[in-house]
């Protein structure tokens, strides 16, 4: 039986409240929430964050445990890659989830991020592109020759 161990998430809850008070753009808020959850070593941090956000911000949506885990994964995916993070912040959450959950190479991920931002793709169109391998194998701005 799974029994929760007593953990003090007070600091994380304060941080989450401060993030939501800033009225950040959607992707900035998602990145910040993901960072706050990612900094906690406990396995149940995402679930605790989701429960806190749902209880304290009932007018806000999108804070299911699954979605908060995705926010944590989003932060971890781009925490050491500011170039890709800037691209990811230009598109919406739904498209970012599609790209994160697809099994793409680093180059393919960049190409998808660039194309999604440049062409303002729908989720359906992005899924078609990924499923049909219909994106460039190299990023749009990458030169043909590298010295």
Model segments located where?
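Basic, low-complexity intrinsically disordered segments
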Residues: 1-147
């Amino acid at each position: 039986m799974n029994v929760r161990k007593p953990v003090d998430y007070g600091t994380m809850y304060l941080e989450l409240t401060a993030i939501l008070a800033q009225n950040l753009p959607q992707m900035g808020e998602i990145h910040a929430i993901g960072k706050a959850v990612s900094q906690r070593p406990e396995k149940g941090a995402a679930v605790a964050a989701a429960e806190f956000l749902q209880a304290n911000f009932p007018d806000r949506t999108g804070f299911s445990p699954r979605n908060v885990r995705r926010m944590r994964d989003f932060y971890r995916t781009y925490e050491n890659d500011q170039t890709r993070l800037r691209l990811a912040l230009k598109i919406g959450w739904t498209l970012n989830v599609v790209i994160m959950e697809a099994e793409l190479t680093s180059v393919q991920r960049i190409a998808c991020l660039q194309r999604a931002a440049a062409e303002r793709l729908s989720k359906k169109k992005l899924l078609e592109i990924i499923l049909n391998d219909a994106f460039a194998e190299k990023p749009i701005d990458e030169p043909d020759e590298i010295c």
